[in-house]
């Protein structure tokens, strides 16, 4: 529903501004430019989708090997001590615990197709424990925030888009996304714990979150000792080594479980081809809408307005061109993806704006969509502090993404 409103708004606002420019300013080129943008954008959307097929098939094939090799189960076991403290209202040994672990682990690995059904199952089980069936319980809200904060270990789709858009090193945003998504998730956990009066000084929570903060601080400090060129080389090298380790690790996990690794890869790769074809109409719709919006001058007005405000406050405005992606992300994943592609098309995949838009895309998730799907599936009407916690986590992710982008690419 939100995406419907956004799609309609792109055209209505573009038409109104185009009419104003024609009638008041005498700009006879605005409507031809808007119509040309529809043809160019639809062509671009198809070409991007076509180019995605190979790389998407590769990574979904690798992910299928990991899934069949039990990597999700391993992550679930690692997370279990911490999650027991984050969900104190869930009885020990309840089946919902397994569903929550599996959902979060699948999200961390970027297995969206597996994560959503597991998430809906977990929400149904949480509803069974909920004394007020129309009101979100504390475990429901914590579970939702962990989903909306978008903790991701392998941002496959973003790297795939960067490769297709001609980035020299599609993986150079890997480390920045890991750092930004860590901050959004940490903020979401802390804020939700404060709302729910959960003891953050519990030994397990304190050691885990504190230890992660120390590791992230050490990474940031280490990169801070390097100049920009060294930072880019080290970041890209580490990212590629980590990704190769993940690929080999998934294959070894599959072999250990006696999985037919080749067949598992082919099964996942087929899903990649299907996914690439399935996204064509969605990408056409959103890129055409954005193209018309930009051709009318509306996007420039939005960006220039924010830029003026930032300049008035004495701030650097390099990040402003990527803000449409950040603003769209809580509302629509497809819309944000379109904004990211538009930013890379307009400014370049290796520009500061192009990279930052990718980090925005990877640092958080679609808060309102997840809230509507998960809570709607069990008939929740009163969301309590879920929206506030989710949006504050998004804000933390956006601010972290900006700071980290200036550090790595500024």
Model-assigned labels for residue ranges:
Residues 1-54, 160-293, 311-313, 385-410:
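Signature of multi-pass transmembrane helix bundles
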Residues 29-128, 257-346:
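Membrane-embedded alpha-helical segments and adjacent helix-loop junctions characteristic
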Residues 101, 105, 140, 231-234, ...:
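Generic signal for short, ordered secondary-structure residues
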């Amino acid at each position: 529903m939100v995406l419907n409103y956004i799609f309609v708004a792109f055209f209505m606002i573009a038409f109104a501004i185009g009419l104003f420019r024609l009638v008041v300013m005498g700009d006879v080129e605005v409507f031809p430019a808007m119509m040309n943008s529809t043809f160019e954008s639809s062509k671009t959307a198809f070409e991007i989708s076509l180019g995605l097929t190979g790389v998407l098939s590769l990574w979904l094939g690798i992910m299928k090997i990991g899934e069949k090799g039990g990597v999700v189960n391993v992550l679930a076991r690692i997370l279990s001590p911490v999650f027991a403290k984050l969900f104190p209202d869930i009885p020990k040994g309840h089946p919902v615990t397994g569903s929550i672990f599996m959902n979060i682990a699948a999200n961390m690995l970027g297995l969206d197709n597996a994560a959503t059904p597991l998430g809906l199952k977990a929400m149904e089980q949480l509803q069974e424990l909920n004394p007020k069936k129309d009101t979100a319980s504390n475990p429901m809200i914590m579970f939702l925030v962990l989903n909306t904060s978008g903790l991701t270990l392998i941002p496959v789709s973003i790297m795939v888009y960067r490769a297709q858009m001609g980035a020299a090193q599609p993986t150079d945003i890997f480390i920045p996304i890991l750092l930004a998504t860590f901050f959004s998730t940490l903020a979401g956990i802390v804020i939700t714990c404060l709302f729910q009066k959960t003891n953050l000084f519990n030994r397990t929570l304190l050691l885990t979150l504190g230890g992660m903060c120390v590791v992230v601080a050490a990474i940031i400090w280490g990169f801070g000792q390097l100049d920009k060129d060294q930072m880019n080389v080290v970041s890209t090298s580490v990212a590629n080594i980590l990704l190769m380790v993940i690929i080999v690790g998934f294959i070894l996990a599959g072999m250990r479980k006696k999985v037919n690794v080749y067949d598992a890869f082919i099964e996942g790769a087929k899903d990649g081809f299907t996914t690439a074809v399935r996204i064509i109409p969605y990408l056409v719709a959103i890129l055409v809408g954005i193209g018309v919006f930009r051709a009318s001058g509306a996007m420039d007005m939005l960006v220039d307005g924010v830029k003026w405000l930032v300049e008035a406050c004495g701030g650097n405005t390099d990040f402003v061109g990527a803000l449409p992606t950040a603003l769209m992300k809580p509302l629509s994943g497809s819309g944000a993806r379109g904004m990211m592609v538009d930013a890379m098309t307009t400014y370049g995949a290796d520009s500061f704006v192009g990279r930052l838009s990718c980090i925005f895309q990877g640092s958080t998730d679609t808060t309102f969509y997840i809230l509507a799907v998960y809570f709607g599936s069990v008939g929740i009407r009163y969301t309590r502090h879920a929206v506030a916690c989710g949006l504050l986590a998004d804000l933390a992710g956006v601010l972290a993404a900006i700071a980290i982008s200036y550090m790595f690419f500024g």
